[in-house]
Amino acid sequence: MRKITANQFIQSCFLLSCLFLTACVITPIQRDDINDPALQNIQRAFSQTVSDALNDPDEDWTSGWLGNMWVNFHEGKQRGLCYQWKYRIHTGVKSTVHAQGWQLTGIVINKGADGEHHAVIVYDPKRIQTAQLLHATVKQPVFVLDAWRQGMPDIYFLSEWLQLARHIRVPAQLINIKQPVSLN
């Protein structure tokens, strides 16, 4: 189990308050605003995956900065760090994403720095090339599935999700998702 220092705890509380302020500006796409049938199917699989995680009798899932502190301070079956959500979401939506003819990959921002954050990207490769994902506009079909922030199946336009980070120390990178043997 990794212990955090008092300074890290104070920084986490500060970041949490910043996230509350940021959350008022950038919000997830509302379910009723999703018109693309493929994304609607992905959203249903995403919602089911989050529900399954939160109701899993073998693991205790949490979310957000307070969830991070909970996971880091307790041993056992606690889950909820952003990379753990990334793996769980990837596993839960992969077959649905592929059935829609879409692709998925991982994304990380601030890799190796304070505020590192992981999530899953889904996109329609017929409408945007993989090499262009990080430069997508709101009008392009590139979406972030991020259950970590609120423990809910939140979907963001990638261009908006990138603005949620208060400080970008390391630019966003696409990453392959390889399921670990254990989420610990």
Report residues per predicted region.
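Bacterial N-terminal signal peptides that target proteins for export
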Residues: 2-14
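C-terminal motif of bacterial Sec signal peptides marking the signal peptidase cleavage site
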Residues: 20-23
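Bacterial signal peptide processing site
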Residues: 25-27
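Second-shell loop/turn segments in exported
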Residues: 32-36, 68-81
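Hydrophobic/aromatic-rich core segments of domains that either
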Residues: 98-154
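C-terminal partner/receptor-binding element of secreted or periplasmic proteins
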Residues: 139-184
